[in-house]
Amino acid sequence: MKLHKLMLGTAAAALGASALLAPVASAQAAEQFFPSLVYRTGPYAPNGTPFANGYSDYLRLVNERGGINGVKIKVEECETGYSTARIVECYERLKGANGGATVFQPLSTGGTFALTEKAPVDKIPLITAGLGRSESADGGVFKWNFPLLGTYWVAADTLVQHVGKQAGGLAKLKGKNIALIYHDSAYGKEPIPLLQKRAEMHGFKLTLLPVAHPGVEQKATWLQVRRDRPDYVFLWGWGVMNSTAIKEAVATGYPRNKMYGVWWSGAEPDVKDVGANAKGYNALALQHGAEKDASVVKEVLAKLHDKGKGTGPREEVGDVLYMRGLISAMLATEGMRVAQAKYGKGKVITGEQMRWGLENMNLTDIGLRSLGFGGVMRTTSTNCSDHMGA
């Protein structure tokens, strides 16, 4: 984990019916259904939309490449507005559609908690890359959850170790005050147990400052920050909450170089309205940052956006949240590729087979480069017990 600074015919009628049967059957076969749970509307749309665009573009790119061993991806979006109830509604509507869902990626911790109870029954895996339930990294217990690349406990631990290093060692955190400004939801509460344990271990004070959805009202929170002057502020926000927090830090004179955001608090929408005042603010990177020069980005532009087949604005291709959607889609299709290697290349797989694929992934340097992700993310592999990947 790293930190970064934000910155079809008339001719056909002449053919015999038998000549038409084979191609029609072929066209109807070999489609793998990937439902896409998105939020392009509501207060979190500025962050949810680029992720959804990246996710869509990569699946389109896979089809432009010929699919996974010839199997094309069929996608259907369902708008959730970041509502857990609507995520469940979309899940129930799409799980049996188009031959059955292959995998779901809810992009919501609340949604992840709700679907975790359903996935084992319906035998459909959940990918929650960099989000969801931290304990679900244990594949021995959570057999259908895959919090690939990182969990919130990993993120919180990384932040504590980083500020400890900045202070001259973890022992130097004794007596210091770390404030957690968090989205008052399942998402925002995820790091608390880890941080409480670390506070007990190292003797620092942990101040918990919840912020109500959607996060535009933070005056009282930052008045407390101004009064207490914590040594560090950890920001666990999403959507407008992030930019609001940075603006309030400016207004109260809290140094941005003492602020550290989780990877969902470190993207372009979080700082663009703050401008130069965001200088010094730090955020975790979920392996990648903005990747405008990545091979996969250039391929997306050439094969999709240059031909009018892209999703969303061309200029966002390669931005942080767009890349996160792109990577999340890639993780799913590579899980599908691994499953095909066991259950039959060129065949449509089941959700249960997909689970096996996700549990046996090995993304090597060579493999990542061949997909266009060289230099974008590190190698990762999963197994029966490790569903996060190492």
Task: Pin down the residues of each PLM region.
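Extracellular/periplasmic Venus flytrap/periplasmic-binding protein
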Residues: A85-E89, G96, S134-E135, K143-G253, ...
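C-terminal segment of classical bacterial N-terminal signal peptides
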Residues: G16-S26
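Segments of small-molecule ligand-sensing domains
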Residues: K309-Y322, T333-A390
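Extracytoplasmic "Venus flytrap"
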Residues: Q32-S56, C78-A85, L107-S108, I181-E190, ...
